Amino acid sequence: MINIYFNNNLCKQFHRGIKGYDVVADLFPELKNKAIAVKVNGESYDLSREITENCTFEVITTNSEEGLEIIRHDTAHIMAQAVKEIFPDTQITIGPTIKDGFYYDFATEHNFSSNDLEIIEKKMIEIINKNESFIREVWTREEAIKFFSSIGEDYKVKIISKIPNNENITVYKQGNFIDLCRGPHAPSTKTSKSFKLTKVSGSYWQGNSSNEKLQRIYGTAWRNEEELKSYLNNLIEIEKRDHRKIGKELELFHIQNEACGQVFWHKKGWTIYRTIENYIRKKLETNGYIEVKTPMLLNKELWEKSGHWDKFRENMFLSEAEDKVLAIKPMNCPCHIQIFNSKIRSYRDLPIRMAEFGICHRYEASGALHGLMRVRGFTQDDAHIFCTESQVISEALKFCNLLMEVYKDFGFTNILVKFSDRPENRAGSDETWDRAESALKKSVEAANLNYVLNPGDGAFYGPKLEFVLKDAIGREWQCGTLQMDFVLPERLGAYYVGSDGKKHHPIMLHRAILGTFERFIGILIEHHSGKFPIWLAPTQLSILTISEESIEYANSLKTKAEEHNIRVELDATNEKINYKIRNHIHKKIPVFWIVGKKEVNENSVSIRYLESNTQQVMPIDKALKTLLTCVSI
């Protein structure tokens, strides 16, 4: 007999070798139809797997996140089976679950198309409708290598060769299909009915571009058709909001192969960029920051001293001149320490809040680049606060308040804060980490911000806060950071003279609000679907003429608006007014002033807003005053 513990240490005895579904039926009969797997001593088991020792026991249901992940894992196996049945010469490699779905990488001479996805889906439905059981088997290494070699699955053999000798080799069967897998799986294929294959892309074996090219098929799977439909509708909305599409439509920017991963900002996009930069600059000035500018190209010796050479060398763009190796900076922090070190500092000088709109470059594989969201050349709204340990709480609190103020102005009010504490490999004593973590926690609490713990994810040099924005359609974007560093200042010889007359290393707070301008603008485009807040819109006002006799008056309105620094366009073309309105709606300009004979005679304008179908007549002075209120921030 074995003891099975459940529900906070309740215990019941069962025969050794009992299967998970029998335990569920006995202890949790109400979950019998919802169970998809179980946890035995914290390890996920199939419902059909035997339990042979005393253990803790939990039920994994389809309603849980773990249950949904199993459904997606099942569906990946079903897709691999379908592909093998349709394209027998294909080799299967790996097929993990990912956020919202799964993928599988295939080695094949056939180029998968969208038409193929439909064919594969039909075959998957056939497999699912057969209600094939997922059967787990444990094989020896020799058996596994012999079998997968015999069916030409070379990549599976490579995977097996990397599995430690003391680990079991497990495979799963469904029908005639066998795949290498740790599991767990649902009892049968019937739980995978709500799925959709979404796209095909290229990939490389083990993610290394020097290895063989593969083809990756992505899919999504859900508990039911309602969840699937909701997700697919969300995908349509994401596609509508794609910043690359909107960026082209609104003539904001473009990216081309001759400058891979770098942005060509067009006039309107550059207007948004400069508006954000000027806004942030004013916020920095108000909050006591000094703005600096540091070189882009630095001798590798500085990066060796800072420790970045060992960690970031592969991501640096390098150059040689006069027998010296130079690197384009991937970050700004070592440069800011050079400014701090340029003269002797006193404790009375601290805190020093040093900011830079720093242009940085990092090598990213071309396949990883994605519009503005992932680039090689970018500008950070970077700042470093040099302070004493006693100043950390107040400085971190001030930063949290500033960050929340900025996010609110950009239209983000749903912010998740993640607190990352000490990692296993770290510098500094436990006492130092205790004080550092306590200081960051106190600052977040003082700012009235809730946070979730991200255990062990801090940097080796100190704990950190990450600020995650939730956009208009519920996606999360990590932008802001606050990282505490008690290593780099010491490594680069930064010190101040304390009240005791002795040298002390400052604490360095790395902080950013936007992250990078490029990515943040991409997020803004998608969050607002290109319909920017009036203060941020590249064109804030369109003046539309109804007839030729109102052109002179419209020009005077344009001049008046420009005198108040309003970004304005005049459309005095010989088109019908409804056409003009549609055209400027397509441009997503937030405010229209429509002027005809009546408005000329009354010294007024007819106001229409982008999101409204109605118009309001208003005297020009009042209309201007109303607009100025909207564009100010």
Swiss-Prot record:
Keywords: Aminoacyl-tRNA synthetase, ATP-binding, Cytoplasm, Ligase, Metal-binding, Nucleotide-binding, Protein biosynthesis, RNA-binding, tRNA-binding, Zinc. Its cofactor is Zn(2+). PROSITE patterns: AA_TRNA_LIGASE_II, TGS. Its EC number is 6.1.1.3. Binds 1 zinc ion per subunit. The keyword Oxidoreductase does not apply. Pfam families: HGTP_anticodon, TGS, tRNA-synt_2b, tRNA_SAD. Residues 242-533 are annotated as: Catalytic. Zn(2+) binds at residues 333, 384, 510. GO terms for biological process: threonyl-tRNA aminoacylation. It comes from the Bacteria. Belongs to the class-II aminoacyl-tRNA synthetase family. NCBIfam families: thrS. Homodimer. Catalyzes the attachment of threonine to tRNA(Thr) in a two-step reaction: L-threonine is first activated by ATP to form Thr-AMP and then transferred to the acceptor end of tRNA(Thr). Also edits incorrectly charged L-seryl-tRNA(Thr). This is Threonine--tRNA ligase. It comes from Ehrlichia canis (strain Jake).
